[in-house]
């Protein structure tokens, strides 16, 4: 008798090719439900609908399809237990040798803006997890596949082992099944419990050489089953990504995501921008960002919000860089970049979408916060000095504010012509960061903009900025001594804008 495969998937990637190989190369019979059965039928493949096999129609609008003894008996039967085989025979149940199942897209559903509770609940799979757990439990006697990435390996197993997957493969596949259901249930529990329960689940995507330092083991995990963010990026060339590369790439992505309307470039070192700029073309933006701090740019991470063209690629090859990320890279640019084969060049079409929540571990637990995704809204800004901003000054203030948001606190950023001139990051006092940023800017500080991620507890930052030639300041406000800083700004002829929003970054 031909072997029996049950196929019931939401993600139909690779489904038809797998099913065709099962039928034509290994003589499997196929049973399937709902949309999967229709897809197989449309492809011209012989398939029996689950409802026809069980003799029970799908009911409750499709909520009950595979929850039937003829399905679960065929999955859970032990082929080496006589009483199990007798039960199968008495109930006219065929043993199922392969279960291919993946689950309703619950996580992608709840990630959609405005999704309702009812919409989320409808995407809670019942039959899928039941089949997945049952077949994973009985791995000694059948194979379960829950990821299209497993299909080719499974077919190779059949070809190499006379049509039967090895026990080692079946056990590995079963583990993947249990991990899949555990992650799925955790996502549901986290969603329904709100802040009462938070579960972080991931599948190891890649073992990394080490973490921040060589003595720290590290690995890269993917959340969910669908590649998104960095797991969806395409690496065009270069060495394997390191832990520090990935951390810096994410910092670069967050900055570049602030700018969509104008070509933008940023260069990151240790998660802080050493140069960020806007320009009419992407090559000009990169040149401006590089020249903002050419010394620090050496060995940096570059992010661009426009595709890499030949001119930009030529500029990128003039110095040592760890990584370059952009939405795309044309063929001529790839050819030029290939001359620097160690540089990791990645493309990611969507650089704007990041995690909605951030997690940080502490002793005995972890902290969860919403990502700092609030968009800058100049209509809510308050001009608190006598001097009012010109349209160009307002645009420069906005640029400086967006960059400052992504600099480690205490953060001070000096900019001009939509280019960073100086970045003071991570100092224990604000005046210290101010002095660093102004020292980097040098004479270029005259007429420039200064942004601060936090309020000024004293007027010393204003006076130090004015002495260096700064013409305008943007900061959150909120200090008990705000009026001291405003008074100093008016005395010294500076423009000051309060945003009402703080952007601490630790």
Swiss-Prot record:
Catalytic activity as recorded in UniProt: (6R)-10-formyltetrahydrofolate + 5-amino-1-(5-phospho-beta-D-ribosyl)imidazole-4-carboxamide = 5-formamido-1-(5-phospho-D-ribosyl)imidazole-4-carboxamide + (6S)-5,6,7,8-tetrahydrofolate; IMP + H2O = 5-formamido-1-(5-phospho-D-ribosyl)imidazole-4-carboxamide
Ranges for domain MGS-like: 1-146
Statement: the UniProt record of this protein carries the keyword Hydrolase: yes
Entry keyword set: Hydrolase, Multifunctional enzyme, Purine biosynthesis, Transferase
Gene3D superfamilies assigned: 3.40.140.20, Methylglyoxal synthase-like domain
GO molecular function, one term: phosphoribosylaminoimidazolecarboxamide formyltransferase activity
InterPro entries linked to this entry: AICAR_Tfase_dup_dom_sf, Cytidine_deaminase-like, MGS-like_dom, MGS-like_dom_sf, PurH-like
GO biological process: 'de novo' IMP biosynthetic process
A Pfam family assignment: AICARFT_IMPCHas
Family annotation (PROSITE patterns): MGS
Pathway given in the UniProt record: Purine metabolism; IMP biosynthesis via de novo pathway; 5-formamido-1-(5-phospho-D-ribosyl)imidazole-4-carboxamide from 5-amino-1-(5-phospho-D-ribosyl)imidazole-4-carboxamide (10-formyl THF route): step 1/1; Purine metabolism; IMP biosynthesis via de novo pathway; IMP from 5-formamido-1-(5-phospho-D-ribosyl)imidazole-4-carboxamide: step 1/1
Source organism, top-level taxon: Bacteria
Keyword Methyltransferase applies: no
EC number: 2.1.2.3, 3.5.4.10
An annotated GO cellular component: cytosol
Recorded domain comment: The IMP cyclohydrolase activity resides in the N-terminal region.
NCBIfam families, A to Z: PRK00881.1, purH
Family indicated by similarity: Belongs to the PurH family.
Designated name of the protein: Bifunctional purine biosynthesis protein PurH
Gene that encodes it: purH
């Amino acid at each position: 008798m031909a072997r029996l495969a049950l196929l019931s998937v939401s993600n139909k990637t690779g489904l038809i090719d797998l099913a065709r190989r099962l039928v034509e190369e290994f003589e499997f019979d196929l049973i399937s439900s709902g949309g999967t059965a229709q897809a197989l039928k449309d492809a011209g493949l012989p398939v029996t609908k689950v409802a026809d096999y069980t003799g029970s129609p799908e009911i409750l609008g499709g909520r009950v399809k595979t929850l039937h003894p003829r399905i679960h008996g065929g999955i859970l039967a032990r082929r080496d237990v006589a009483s199990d085989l007798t039960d199968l025979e008495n109930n006219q149940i065929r043993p199922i040798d392969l279960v291919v199942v993946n689950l309703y897209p619950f996580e992608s559903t709840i990630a959609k803006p405005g999704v309702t509770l009812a919409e989320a609940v409808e995407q809670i799979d019942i039959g899928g997890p039941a089949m997945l757990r049952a077949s994973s439990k009985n791995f000694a006697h059948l194979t379960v596949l829950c990821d299209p990435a497993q299909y080719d390996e499974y077919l190779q197993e059949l070809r190499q082992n006379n049509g039967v997957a090895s026990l080692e493969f079946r056990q590995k596949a079963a583990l993947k099944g249990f991990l899949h259901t555990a992650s799925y249930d955790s996502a549901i529990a986290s969603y329904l419990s709100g802040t009462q329960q938070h579960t972080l689940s991931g599948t190891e995507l890649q073992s990394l050489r080490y973490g921040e330092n060589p003595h720290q083991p590290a690995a890269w995990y993917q959340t969910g089953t669908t590649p998104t963010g960095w797991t969806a990026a395409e690496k065009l060339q270069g060495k394997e990504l390191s832990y520090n590369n990935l951390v810096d790439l994410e910092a670069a992505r967050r900055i570049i995501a602030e700018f969509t309307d104008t070509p933008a470039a940023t260069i990151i070192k240790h998660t802080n921008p050493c140069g960020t700029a806007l320009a009419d073309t992407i090559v000009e933006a990169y040149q401006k960002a590089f020249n903002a701090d050419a010394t620090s740019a050496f060995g940096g991470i570059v992010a661009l919000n426009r595709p890499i063209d030949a001119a930009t690629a030529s500029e990128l090859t003039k110095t040592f860089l760890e990584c370059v990320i952009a939405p795309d890279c044309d063929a001529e640019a790839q050819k030029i970049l290939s001359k620097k084969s160690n540089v990791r060049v990645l493309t990611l079409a969507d650089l704007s979408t990041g995690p909605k929540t951030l997690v940080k571990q502490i002793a005995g637990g972890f902290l969860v916060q919403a990502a700092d995704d609030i968009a800058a809204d100049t209509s809510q800004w308050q001009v608190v000095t006598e001097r009012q901003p010109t349209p160009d000054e307002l645009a420069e203030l906005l640029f400086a504010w967006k960059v400052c948001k992504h600099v480690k606190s205490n953060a001070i950023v000096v900019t001009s012509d939509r280019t960073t001139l100086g970045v003071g990051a991570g100092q224990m006092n604000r005046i210290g960061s101010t002095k660093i940023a102004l020292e980097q800017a040098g004479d270029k500080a005259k007429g420039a903009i200064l942004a601060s991620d936090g309020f000024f507890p004293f007027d010393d930052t204003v006076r130090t900025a004015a002495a260096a030639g700064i013409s305008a300041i943007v900061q959150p406000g909120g200090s008990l001594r705000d009026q001291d800083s405003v008074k100093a700004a008016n005395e010294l002829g500076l423009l000051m804008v309060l945003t009402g929003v703080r952007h601490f970054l630790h």
